[in-house]
């Protein structure tokens, strides 16, 4: 540093010392400490629950974990017309947490259990809409009377997985703002378009926001289910849920009534998708049962665990212990590599939530196999085999995957297991998985179908012609050429057919081997090495299992493609997987190739739905 630079530095230090001395005060009585920060704004959280026994433990657990000073929060909780234990769960939780919060208001109504004009517990009748509007208005009035800064409405089946949600919404400084909630479909808690009659209107703006291709806080005509109102804003005094505005002529629906109130008050609603805030279930049809509702939320919870950590219930409510079973299978096998502990823990928790008992099988880690292991097991690659997309030979990862399944087939044969299920650890379950699978097993028994293997999840590779439906068995087709072994059912006879083919001496990837064995592989040279190809293979339709991730997704990991060659451990195989169709999503099928439609969806195509 030059002499001039040193002098400037010393002068700066002298000025800094002088400033510090002045702030300390010349006399002791002039010294002062910096001002303390503002306290967090006060928030009233309003929860309205009806027949929400299946979702409340996790939803309340998410409230427990919110990073916000509890002493600055008041709780306003109402429940009514319940057939289940909603009231008991809420009462227990409130008793246990009430001392943590500034104020608690509890409004239960035990009787009657139904509205006079409703057809089922899921039916939104005129009386039910009106009652919900009155409850929301009562919560809003309570917040105003206690001079709360904000009111935060949270539906009893909306799962907040982001503990900073409340802080993030407050920081947006909007009069009405909602966090975008994820679901299994395109459905979410906002609209991008509204007709002149107040109904939902599909717009090109919706999907880019829903997919988070555009991120930010967007002005929208409708938010619902979970949203924050800033009561400090002057315009918020004109917002009401009930009675509807004097000029209101639209549908008698609580979310539309409030959207109209915002419009009349010239208050813009905003939807934020800057982060993953939480999840909500897709609405069911009005004739759905409470069991459907419970399973619907269970699926929401499982989807949340695919993308994030485990979802835990509140520690302040009593949770009945689940009793897993094998669903009439002789065994349910779960394949997992020991070092993939995140997948192992997620699948263990998921299967527990589904109440499915299973046997954990440590997968064979192909990279740990040395040449002597390979030689000792008599493993040789199928002559002429090349990966269809990269032209490479078999990888150690694919070898390990094959051996993992092969070892299960051996165990099935040795233990004489008549019917088994095999699951990998990188899958997600479709809604109503267990019930749909139980229905399939029942139909198989009634139809006396002669089967060896049934795909529960796969990638259909033959996309030109429809597959043959199976008479007498709903949701089942004869399987054509397919990829993936995410999950399948296998009979004792099927396992022995695969073993009798002696595949270790002519190995190819397991999801290429299976189509060879049911004689649907398009490359006849591969099939020619196996003289007996009579495996009776089928597939559920629609599928019950899908991968958790596809190529290009955040968090995608492949232990089969990201490996080394089977006979050359110095040659890595992590080629450009963007060119590999194998790990991409199912290609769109031509209309003439679609399989015969089976049972209808349990979801409504309603005005709120974005399916």
Swiss-Prot record:
Q: List the disulfide bonds.
A: none
Please give the biological process terms from Gene Ontology that the record holds. Answer: positive regulation of collagen fibril organization
The answer to whether keyword Nucleotide-binding applies is no
Reaction catalysis annotation: (5R)-5-hydroxy-L-lysyl-[collagen] + UDP-alpha-D-galactose = (5R)-5-O-(beta-D-galactosyl)-5-hydroxy-L-lysyl-[collagen] + UDP + H(+)
Name the residue ranges with Basic and acidic residues bias.
Answer: 576-591
**Where does the record say carbohydrate is attached?**
85, 173, 370, 373, 568
The UniProt GO MF terms for this protein read: procollagen galactosyltransferase activity
* UniProt motif Prevents secretion from ER: location: 608-611
Keywords carried by this UniProt record: Endoplasmic reticulum, Glycoprotein, Glycosyltransferase, Signal, Transferase
The region called Disordered is annotated at 576-611
Q: Could you say which enzyme class this protein belongs to? A: transferase
Q: Chief subcellular site?
A: endoplasmic reticulum
Where located? Endoplasmic reticulum lumen
Entry's Gene Ontology cellular component terms: endoplasmic reticulum lumen
**Ribonucleoprotein listed as a keyword:** no
Q: Which residues form the signal peptide?
A: 1-24
The UniProt similarity line reads: Belongs to the glycosyltransferase 25 family.
Give a short account of what the protein does: Beta-galactosyltransferase that transfers beta-galactose to hydroxylysine residues of type I collagen. By acting on collagen glycosylation, facilitates the formation of collagen triple helix.
- The identity of this protein, by name, is Procollagen galactosyltransferase 1-B
- From what organism does this protein derive? Xenopus laevis
Q: Which gene encodes it?
A: colgalt1-b
């Amino acid at each position: 540093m030059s002499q001039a630079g040193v002098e400037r530095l010393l002068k700066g230090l002298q000025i800094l010392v002088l400033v510090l001395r002045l702030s300390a005060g010349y006399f002791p009585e002039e010294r002062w400490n910096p001002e303390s920060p503002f306290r967090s704004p006060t928030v009233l959280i309003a929860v309205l629950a009806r027949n929400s026994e299946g979702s409340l433990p996790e939803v309340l657990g998410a409230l427990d974990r919110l990073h916000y000073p509890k002493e600055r929060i008041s709780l306003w909780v109402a429940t009514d017309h319940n057939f289940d234990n909603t009231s008991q769960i809420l009462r227990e939780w409130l008793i246990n947490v009430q001392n943590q919060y500034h104020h608690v208001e509890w409004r239960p109504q035990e009787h009657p259990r139904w509205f006079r004009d409703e057809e089922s517990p899921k039916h939104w009748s005129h009386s039910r809409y009106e009652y919900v509007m009155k409850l929301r208005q009562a919560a809003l009035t309570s917040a105003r009377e206690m001079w709360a800064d904000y009111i935060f409405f949270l539906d009893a089946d909306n799962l907040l997985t982001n503990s900073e949600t409340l802080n993030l919404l407050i920081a947006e400084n909007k009069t009405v703002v909602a966090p975008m909630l994820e679901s299994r479909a395109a459905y979410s808690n906002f609209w991008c378009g509204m007709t002149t009659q107040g109904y939902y209107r599909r717009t090109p703006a919706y999907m880019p926001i829903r997919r988070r291709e555009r991120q930010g806080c967007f002005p929208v005509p409708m938010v619902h289910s979970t949203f924050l109102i800033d009561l400090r804003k002057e315009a918020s005094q004109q917002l009401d849920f009930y009675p509807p505005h004097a000029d209101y002529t639209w549908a008698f629906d609580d979310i539309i009534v409030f959207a109209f109130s915002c419009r009349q008050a010239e208050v813009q609603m905003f939807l934020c998708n800057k982060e993953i805030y939480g999840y909500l279930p897709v609405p069911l049809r009005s004739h759905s049962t409470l069991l459907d509702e419970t399973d619907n939320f269970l699926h929401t919870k499982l989807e949340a665990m695919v993308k994030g950590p485990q979802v835990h219930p509140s520690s302040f409510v009593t949770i009945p212990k689940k009793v897993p079973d094998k669903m009439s299978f002789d065994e349910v096998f779960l394949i997992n590599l020991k070092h993939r502990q995140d997948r192992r823990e997620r699948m263990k928790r998921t299967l527990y939530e589904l109440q499915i008992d299973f046997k954990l099988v440590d997968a064979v880690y192909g990279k740990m196999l040395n040449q002597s292991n390979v030689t000792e097991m008599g493993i040789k690659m199928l002559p002429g085999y090349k990966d269809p997309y990269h032209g490479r030979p078999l990888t150690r990862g694919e070898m390990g995957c094959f051996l993992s399944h092969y070892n299960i087939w051996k165990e099935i044969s040795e233990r004489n297991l008549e019917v088994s299920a095999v699951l990998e650890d990188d899958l997600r379950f479709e809604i109503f998985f267990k019930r749909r699978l139980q229905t399939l097993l029942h139909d198989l028994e009634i139809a006396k179908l002669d089967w060896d293997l049934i795909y529960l999840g796969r990638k259909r590779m033959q996309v030109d012609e429809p597959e043959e439906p199976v008479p007498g068995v709903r949701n089942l087709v004869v399987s054509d050429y397919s990829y993936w072994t995410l999950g399948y059912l296998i009979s004792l006879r099927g396992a022995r057919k695969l073993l009798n083919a002696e595949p270790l001496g002519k190995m190819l990837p397991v999801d290429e081997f299976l189509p060879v064995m049911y004689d649907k592989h398009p490359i006849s040279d591969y099939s020619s090495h196996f003289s007996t190809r009579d495996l009776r293979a089928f597939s559920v339709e629609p599928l019950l299992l899908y991968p958790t991730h596809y190529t290009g997704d955040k968090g995608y990991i492949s232990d089969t493609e990201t490996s080394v060659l089977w006979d050359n451990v110095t040659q890595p195989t992590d080629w450009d997987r963007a060119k590999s169709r194998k790990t991409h999503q199912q290609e769109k099928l031509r209309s003439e190739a679609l399989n015969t439609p089976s049972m209808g969806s349990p979801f409504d195509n309603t005005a709120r739905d974005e399916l």
